[in-house]
């Protein structure tokens, strides 16, 4: 009897985490200049992340030169993998050679499309490149929750070493980091993130759309903070109320809220 050969490959359904870039103009010169201004000096920002281009916010008569946008993103170390478009946009959008993709982020709630777009779709994965304004809370919150084993939910990941530039950690539950998260390092979790040291890199919590996820740290100095795809970068200085201090970050009405923590 001949032995059955093991298959050399398999094809199955799956999902891939990706950033979602939503241009609001088809003026490629202006768009390229703005992307370069924001990210050229921080090449580790994208760090070879895959990115989908969402053209649904463009006006009906606008045609974005997607090939030029792909070139700009490649120069910034982002890898474009496809285009998200409305049925009316599909014809011209796919003419640039990228596949059409489905997006499973939350849709605007109705009303004026432009106003709803400004409120931001909450995208999946590591979030769309749109800045959410940080709301300052007037009152301090209680001390950072304990990270002892009894308090942890199943699937919590603990990292007890410093994370250097270029290192990335992904947790399918909560993530606890007991040492420094350096500039250029990235911590990602489907649940909450706790950093018991300086947070200087990127922290992305609730990356599968968990709007209740939070980020806690004992020294807030990040390059980027994101919850459920809504994020803010350190390009604008962090307010003194929580900069380089213990803080937590949460979502309220699709807006990032930063609150100082009382450490006792």
From Swiss-Prot:
Q: Pfam families from the xrefs?
A: MinC_C, MinC_N
Q: Which domain of life is it from?
A: Bacteria
Return the Low complexity bias intervals. 124-147
Q: List the disulfide bonds.
A: none
Q: Does the keyword Cell division apply?
A: yes
The Gene Ontology biological process annotation of the record reads: cell morphogenesis; division septum assembly; regulation of cell division; regulation of cell septum assembly
| Residues annotated as signal peptide | none
Feature: compositional bias, Basic and acidic residues: 110-122
Region (Disordered): which ranges? Answer: 103-147
Keywords (A to Z) from UniProt: Cell cycle, Cell division, Septation
HAMAP family named in the record: MinC
Q: What does this protein do?
A: Cell division inhibitor that blocks the formation of polar Z ring septums. Rapidly oscillates between the poles of the cell to destabilize FtsZ filaments that have formed before they mature into polar Z rings. Prevents FtsZ polymerization.
The family classification in the record reads:
Belongs to the MinC family.
Q: How does it assemble?
A: Interacts with MinD and FtsZ.
| Protein name per Swiss-Prot or TrEMBL | Probable septum site-determining protein MinC
Q: Give the species.
A: Ralstonia pickettii (strain 12J)
């Amino acid at each position: 009897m001949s032995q059955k050969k093991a298959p050399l490959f398999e094809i199955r359904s799956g999902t891939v985490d990706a950033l979602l870039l939503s241009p609001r103009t088809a003026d490629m010169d202006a768009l390229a200049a703005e992307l370069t201004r924001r990210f050229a000096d921080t090449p580790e920002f994208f760090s070879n992340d895959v990115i989908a281009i969402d053209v649904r916010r463009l006006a009906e008569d606008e045609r974005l030169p997607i090939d030029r946008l792909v070139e700009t993103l490649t120069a910034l170390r982002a890898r474009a993998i496809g285009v998200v478009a409305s049925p009316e946009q599909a014809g011209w959008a796919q003419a640039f050679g990228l596949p059409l993709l489905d997006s499973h982020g939350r849709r605007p709630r109705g009303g004026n499309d432009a106003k709803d777009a400004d409120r931001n779709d909450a995208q999946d994965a590591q979030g769309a490149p749109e800045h959410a304004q940080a709301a300052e809370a007037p009152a301090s919150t209680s001390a950072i929750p304990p990270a002892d084993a009894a308090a942890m939910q199943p699937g919590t990941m603990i990292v007890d070493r410093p994370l250097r530039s270029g290192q990335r950690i992904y947790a399918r539950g909560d993530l606890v980091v007991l040492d420094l998260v350096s500039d250029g390092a990235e911590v990602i979790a489907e649940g909450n993130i706790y950093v018991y040291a300086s947070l200087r890199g990127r922290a992305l919590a609730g990356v599968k759309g968990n709007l209740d996820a939070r980020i806690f740290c004992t020294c807030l100095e990040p390059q980027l903070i994101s919850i459920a795809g809504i994020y803010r970068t350190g390009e604008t200085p962090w307010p003194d109320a929580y900069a380089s201090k213990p803080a937590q970050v949460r979502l309220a009405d699709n807006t990032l809220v930063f609150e100082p923590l009382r450490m006792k």
